[in-house]
Amino acid sequence: MNKIIGIAFFTVSFSVGATVSAAGQAAQIDPLGYTISTPHPIDPAAGTTNPSALATQRQNPYLGSVPSGKATDEVIALSLPQAIALGLRYNLGLIESNQSSADGRAQRLRALSALLPELSLEGRQGVADQSLKEFGLRLPSIAGFPGLPATSGSFGFQDSRISMTQSIYNSLLRNRYQAERKAEQASALSAADARDVVVYAVGASYLQVVAAVARVETARAQLASARELDQQTEDRVSAQLSPEIDSLRAQVQKHTVEQQVTNASNDLEKAKLTLARITGLPIDQKFTATDAAEYREVTGLTEKSAIGHAREFRADMRSAAASVREAEYRLRSEKGQRLPALSFRADYGGAGVNVGAFSQVYTVGGQVSLPLYTGGRIRADIDQAQSNLTRRQAEYEDLEGRIVYDVRVAWLDMQASDSSVKVAESNRALADRALTQSQDRYLNGVANYLEVLRAEEAVTEAAENYIRSLYSFNVAKMALARAMGSAESEIQDFFGGK
């Protein structure tokens, strides 16, 4: 359940970050430009550890990791598969899930031990002086005989035995063991589901880095264009072909784009830091993302087949089913308290005043116990187990609906983003053509600089729309792979072997 809450926090926090980022970009862009409405994907950079790193770690451990190794001066090349492999090894959320699975295994072994024979070796050595009156020993009165003494007198003894106890039939212990088996199975499946969450988290963060790289490259290309146009405008003003205000506008535009390059570079470095935190890379390690963002359609898959695949392979679904079975066995276990319990005990060894005078001794016995009155304790235990079973059944039924919801939402986002990518790519080409024509018109004295400035803003918006749409599309594919319950295997198919 904690893991589900962590996933929800992960998605919501990233979504808010992407919305704020998109809003900030829109404030700098002409609303009449080439704006395309696209679904807002998650933004890993929004998963900050401020103001409390510990609070964030507890709420969503998938944003953290156990750093591996030491940073080097070398700039390493990091591909998407390599980043995912690091995340699957060092991500904090997966480490915690694996440890929970180990805890479940320990609980099962503890429950099993109660059903197995227990052997122990016991030894005693002591000196005693027993009261004969305490045992009720007395002799009839005989004239001239003083009778038995009050105590036996001091004597030593030694006793050494090996003993065995075995539960022959105990409904509580048997069903408790079955419950722990199912709990271990549910924990292992939960750890398997955590792997999909890590793949999704690392993939989305990696794509954020790739998108940030594209924004930096776009901003640098726009800066080169702005500098060239600034020089051309300055030459036209010097030749008295354009008013001085055109040169001033060109300089303002150049400085604006320079700041955009700075901001884009800053966002790139923060995205890299976020990826390093999720994957376990040393925070000071420099790296470059080698896999560029590409548009690749998902083929051979329908929404219906994706839902069927999710119902069959989602590990959290199977974990929830195992939790229901666990709750059923726990209910049987509590009801078993009302049944007789049969156990066996035996011991064998030697006893005497010393080792040389040992005599063979042994004890064999059985025990049957049946509670007659417990003050309502058993009834309370049964009610609590029944309540837990009802809760687990409700969670399982809810998860069935949530799985369909996850797949359909991811599918809708992928379709919408797919359309956005195609429109954005077309608009980007049109905006580039419009800018070229505006520059030609300006240099030929047919148009003023404002037309060129508007065309540059349109190119900027079209480029940003394409980057955002492509990022949304790829993250939607990541979300679909995670929703289907096979993120590790589907990533290769969805991203062309990357």
Whereabouts are the PLM-identified features?
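Amphipathic alpha-helical coiled-coil scaffold segments and their short linker/junction regions
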Residues: 87-88, 140-148, 242, 246-253, ...
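Amphipathic alpha-helical coiled-coil segments
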Residues: 96-111, 194, 198-217, 228, ...
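Acidic, low-complexity, intrinsically disordered peripheral segments
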Residues: 2-13, 20-48, 129, 465-498
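Bacterial Sec-pathway N-terminal export signals of envelope proteins
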Residues: 23-124, 130-131, 289-324, 371-372, ...
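ATP/adenylate-binding site constellation spanning eukaryotic-like Ser/Thr protein kinases
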Residues: 80, 116, 199, 280, ...
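Small/polar-residue-enriched beta-strand and adjacent coil segments characteristic
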Residues: 76-79, 118-194, 309, 313-399, ...
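Periplasmic alpha-helical coiled-coil/stalk elements that build and connect Gram-negative outer-membrane
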Residues: 3, 195-309, 413, 458-459
